[in-house]
Amino acid sequence: MKALSKLKAEEGIWMTDVPVPELGHNDLLIKIRKTAICGTDVHIYNWDEWSQKTIPVPMVVGHEYVGEVVGIGQEVKGFKIGDRVSGEGHITCGHCRNCRGGRTHLCRNTIGVGVNRPGCFAEYLVIPAFNAFKIPDNISDDLASIFDPFGNAVHTALSFDLVGEDVLVSGAGPIGIMAAAVAKHVGARNVVITDVNEYRLELARKMGITRAVNVAKENLNDVMAELGMTEGFDVGLEMSGAPPAFRTMLDTMNHGGRIAMLGIPPSDMSIDWTKVIFKGLFIKGIYGREMFETWYKMAALIQSGLDLSPIITHRFSIDDFQKGFDAMRSGQSGKVILSWD
């Protein structure tokens, strides 16, 4: 079968021919329809320090997808041939304390599809049936293919009660924009998103965010005054991993504010901890998606009218995968979809 693989320990990704993966007793064989390129895939393409320490070579990569069930392991129940599915990219052990306690998203032995085991940038993918999620008929293939990053956004945004709250989102990448859209959809009062990338801030405006602020050109305190905010933000969603953005968030949070952090800083990050202490801030780290509560919430949000379509900006045939990676690496894109049909 055709597959995109990390063949060499250097920059790039390559189209290869690999065997169709073997179906285990508890697995599903999925024929891939569409995949989306994640920031993680760009890290792997660039072969940065994280990738060099993490990714085995050679390996099929990718973890954002939608496809059709074409094979079912003999122990699997609840699925049938032809079911349209996406899937949770974190394969958990089932045996650690968190798994046995129902907190599978916190499994200490998590293995990543397309990171530690063969991924979805291929004509076929095998995953445990436990990890598959059936896609409702009224959700398109395009949207289903980005459920993985949408899940990061939903998990982060819905960490706290947002109704009537003022929310600051730092980082207008696709996940940050989707998190801001979720916050607005579920009843936040003001949702402000910050970045320095004007292309992505314009995407946020198309998604109906209250204010998309280029912090290289505008002062966040001026924006808060314009919105009639006198006490600071109630909820912060840190999606950028940029130390200056997190420090600004700490500066502008209200006392008793709550922060969910998904963005990964590039290295050690120094902050003024007295602001955390004296403001009584609550900071929560976010990893992946809650299994599978986040997935049900994703489907319900879309079915209740949340429109994510502006975030998908580029579509290519898999034969033009290089154009897709070029678009992602340029910073001038939202989500990029690769079609395998």
Swiss-Prot record:
NAD(+) binds at I175, D195, R200, L262, G263, I264, I286, Y287. GO terms for cellular component: cytoplasm. It holds the Pfam family ADH_zinc_N. One of its GO terms (molecular function) is L-threonine 3-dehydrogenase activity. The keyword rRNA processing does not apply. The record marks D148 as: Important for catalytic activity for the proton relay mechanism but does not participate directly in the coordination of zinc atom. Its main location: cytoplasm. It is found in: Cytoplasm. Homotetramer. Belongs to the zinc-containing alcohol dehydrogenase family. This is L-threonine 3-dehydrogenase. It comes from Shigella boydii serotype 18 (strain CDC 3083-94 / BS512). The gene is tdh.
